[in-house]
Amino acid sequence: VTLTLPPAES
């Protein structure tokens, strides 16, 4: 399955 990652906010 393909996981969708949220935009990384450091």
UniProtKB/Swiss-Prot annotation:
Q: Provide the primary localization.
A: secreted
Where is this protein localized, as stated in its record? Answer: Secreted
Query: According to its UniProt record, in which tissues is this protein expressed?
Result: Expressed by the venom gland.
**A cellular-component GO term for this protein:** extracellular region
Presence of keyword Secreted: yes
Alphabetically list the UniProt keywords: Amidation, Secreted
PTM-bearing positions, type Serine amide: S10
Please identify the protein, giving its name as recorded. Cryptide Pep-17
Q: What is the lineage of its organism?
A: Eukaryota, Metazoa, Ecdysozoa, Arthropoda, Chelicerata
